[in-house]
């Protein structure tokens, strides 16, 4: 009986740990006219991640913040004086490469993070 209880506790703990990782969501919002962005990590769902990114963008001074992307791995923002790119992927380098590709020439990575 103790063994069965032990296995049940281990299974529950493993499920909770897996669930927390599986539902950690990040999001990016961007305001074109003033080149401000919001970047959020480790939110419980897409709605929370989107709201967090929009709030951060507005708090940074963004006047026309728009939600751009959410992700459950790594996310990156690339910017130049004229362009913006958002990327995501299973690694930081993949997210950054996508952001740079979407942004175009003359862009640099402004922020890049991975869910933990």
Could you say what each language-model-derived stretch is?
Residues 2-6, 18-116:
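Helix-coil modules at protein/domain termini and other flexible surface or pore-lining loops
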Residues 8-16:
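Bacterial N-terminal signal peptides
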């Amino acid at each position: 009986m103790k063994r069965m209880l032990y296995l049940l506790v281990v299974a529950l703990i493993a499920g909770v740990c897996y669930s927390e990782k599986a539902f950690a969501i990040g999001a990016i919002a961007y305001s074109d006219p003033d080149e401000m962005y919001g970047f959020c990590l480790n939110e419980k769902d897409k709605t929370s991640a989107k709201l967090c990114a929009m709030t951060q963008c507005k708090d940074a001074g963004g006047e026309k913040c728009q939600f751009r992307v959410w992700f459950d791995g790594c996310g990156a923002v690339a910017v130049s004086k004229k362009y913006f790119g958002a990327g995501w992927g299973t690694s930081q380098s993949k997210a950054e490469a996508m952001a740079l590709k979407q942004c175009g020439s003359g862009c640099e990575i402004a922020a890049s993070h991975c869910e933990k």
